[in-house]
Amino acid sequence: MPRVARPFRRRRCNRARAFLEIANDESYDAVWCARGGYGSCRVADAILRGLAEPARRKAYLGYSDAGMLLAGLYRAGFEAVAHGPMAEDILRDGGEVAVRRALAWLVDAAPETLEPTVGGARNTAAFNITILSQLLGTPLQPDLEGHVVMLEEVSEAMYRIDRSLFHITSNVQIKRVAGIMLGRCNKIPPNEPDFGMSEEEVARYWCRRSGVPWLGRADIGHDIDNKIVPFGGSARPDA
């Protein structure tokens, strides 16, 4: 095995072990992701197999690459899973706003923390575009039939966003969602030559072509204004 692989493998095992230690501990009420980063697809299976009954009574919050884990948890029937700010957001300018929002949801299930369209009878879910595209067709893919699916992106060129949205809207299960909403796509690198369409134009195009309803814009993204989107419903079941 190459030497460079050992530290990564060790970190991977440590991350899974640390997650399970907290998730299965009765004395904790929530698991709040510190950051996204890469590698969650490598630990998700071990984590999901190792979760015990106390883990089902917790709230889980994160976004970006953590969406792999959130998807797996939701597929496994966990009821308090949400896309929203992470601890690392404190490092952004004005990041304390995002952190307060996360804590208000985790501690009090405060309704003002939610993305404004969340609520009512419609189920919801939210993902980073690249993450959702890459988990489709895997054991982590949850059943999103009838859900409003909100999507956001960061640091991906428009041609990649286009390709990912093609893949998402072509999926048989995604064709049964209630519709797609587009959050913010931040820090898009320039295309050379220019792609010629904005992120909203691209999303509208693939919704129209696939027959998936376009439901407008969502207040989520890789930024301090990232609102909370619970998977399935508008409130934490233990609130």
Which residues make up each language-model segment?
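Charged helix-capping and loop-helix junction motifs
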Residues: 11-17, 163-168, 194-202
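N-terminal glycine-rich "phosphate-gripper" loop used for MgATP/nucleotide binding
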Residues: 32-41, 63
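ATP/NTP phosphate-donor binding region
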Residues: 1-27
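Internal helical hairpin/lid segments
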Residues: 140-192
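Conserved anion/nucleotide-ligand pocket segment
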Residues: 78-137
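Short, acidic/small-residue loops that bind anionic groups at enzyme active sites
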Residues: 48-72, 80-86, 213-215
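ATP/nucleoside-binding phosphotransfer catalytic cores, i.e., glycine-rich phosphate-binding loops
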Residues: 184-239
